[in-house]
């Protein structure tokens, strides 16, 4: 029934697995989640801009396979000749077997988290083609940040978790407030820069006075 429905991944899980990556649970280097899942696109990082552009493209009749130009997305292709000035990462076969190649690949990715200087990145999967990462989306303006956090979030977990007793960790963050995004640090234990980028984005002080009950 849904054979021709575009499948687009997002969120931190897909974002941090957008290229070849080490999986702690399986203790091995795995493919980009775009390869393993069979999805059409990844909207990585903070996706407010990219998901709107994807939706507008689909609404206008552009096939999902041709949506290869949106900042903040990852797509698959057998041809990188039409990608402007890409940086070719070590192939999956290389990073799977060579620790230095893995480190080199991650270092290149880390240096391309700034939307103003980042280049497209291409990772080869042999006869499966390439996984190509476009530069990150532009950061949100303060007004956009205010609008995002003024939405009517419920602060509740999905009902599917009720039979398991809920999500205990939610108690720690349920009443926390998001004041900013991004981090210019490079802490090796933290994925914040890799997910949200280096550019700090902040809410206005007045936005906190409009908090919903």
Per-region residue spans from a language model:
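Catalytic cores of nucleotide-enabled group-transfer and carboxylate-activating enzymes in metabolic
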Residues: 26-31, 35, 43-44, 135, ...
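Short, glycine-/Ser/Thr-/acidic-enriched flexible segments
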Residues: 14, 48-49, 153-155, 182-185, ...
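Glycine-rich, aromatic-lined ligand/substrate-binding cores of catalytic
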Residues: 139-144, 148-152, 167-170
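N-terminal pre-triad scaffold of radical SAM enzymes
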Residues: 164-191
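Iron-sulfur (Fe-S) cluster-binding segments and ferredoxin-like electron-carrier domains
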Residues: 190-203
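Glycine-rich beta-alpha loop elements in corrinoid/cobalamin-binding modules
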Residues: 1-126, 133-134
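Conserved small/polar residues in nucleotide/adenosyl-binding loops
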Residues: 209-213
């Amino acid at each position: 029934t849904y054979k021709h429905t575009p499948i687009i991944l997002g969120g931190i899980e897909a974002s941090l697995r957008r290229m070849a990556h080490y999986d702690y649970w399986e203790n091995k280097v795995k493919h980009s989640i775009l390869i393993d899942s069979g999805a059409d696109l990844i909207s990585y990082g903070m996706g407010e801009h990219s998901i709107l552009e994807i939706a507008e493209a689909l609404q206008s009749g552009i096939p999902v396979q041709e949506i290869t130009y949106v900042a903040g997305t990852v797509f698959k292709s057998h041809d990188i000749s039409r990608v402007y000035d890409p940086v070719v990462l070590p192939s999956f076969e290389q990073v799977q077997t060579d620790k230095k190649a893995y480190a080199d690949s991650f270092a290149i990715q880390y240096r391309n988290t700034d939307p103003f200087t980042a280049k497209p990145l291409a990772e080869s999967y042999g006869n499966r083609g390439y996984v190509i990462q476009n530069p990150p989306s532009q950061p949100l303006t303060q007004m956009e940040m205010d609008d995002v956090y003024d939405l009517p979030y419920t602060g509740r977990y999905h009902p599917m978790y009720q039979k398991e007793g809920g999500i205990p960790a939610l108690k720690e963050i349920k009443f926390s407030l998001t004041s900013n995004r991004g981090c210019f640090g490079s802490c090796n234990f933290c994925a914040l820069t890799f997910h949200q980028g280096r550019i700090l984005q902040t809410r206005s002080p007045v936005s906190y006075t409009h908090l919903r009950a």
